[in-house]
Amino acid sequence: ISKRKKIIKNYFYNDNFYRNLLKKKKNNRLKSEYSKIKKYKKMIKFVYQDSPKGTGDAVLRCKNLINSKYFLMLMPDDLIINNNCSHSLIKLHNKFNSSIIASRKVNKKNVSRWGIFKIKKINKRNFLINDVVEKPSIKSAPSNYAVIGRYILPKKIFRILRKQKPGLNNEIHITDAIRTLILQKDKFIGHIFAGKYLDCGSMKGYINSSLKISKI
């Protein structure tokens, strides 16, 4: 995160705020949520990015926190409800012993907003990823299967990111590093997840997503 975005860290560590709020409100739901925050904040580590240099740069800064051969990565502006997508990816990883990336079909008119896969179908919900392109034009897009922000990636991707040159918008993209591994014949499986997808990557998307969740 950016050092300027203190609100994210305060969400987990501002204990006085929560204690005072619970004294005033005496709300069981708030009490339950605060209990969850206390439980999980012990597991959370914060890594700072000095300037927005892309997702690849942000991931590279977490290198020293990863000890296993593979790791699970989530993009917080891609929200998936009514299904545990991460659990599904882990099951597939154990089955195929490979990297797994969540995907969904998008309107062909909107492919330039996404990373897009070139695929070879395995079954109804899974496909082999032969290539991935970051935000292609409609004409150059290899499909309309988009990258969604749930990944199981190999630790060796850090080696690629360390040497990677900036791409689109002069940023280091995780998609470009994944593409390098695919071209080196690393196996990547795409998974069309169950559940409802909510895009929180824009102010409009965030507000719409909040309204939808409030009705659940």
Region annotations inferred by a language model:
Residues I8, Y18-K23, L30-I119, R162-Q164:
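Conserved beta-loop-beta/alpha segment of the NTase-like Rossmann-fold superfamily
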Residues K26, I80-I81, T175, K196:
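Residue-level signal for alpha-helical context at structural boundaries
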Residues L72, S86, I90, I122-L198, ...:
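Catalytic-core segments of class I nucleotidyltransferases/pyrophosphorylases
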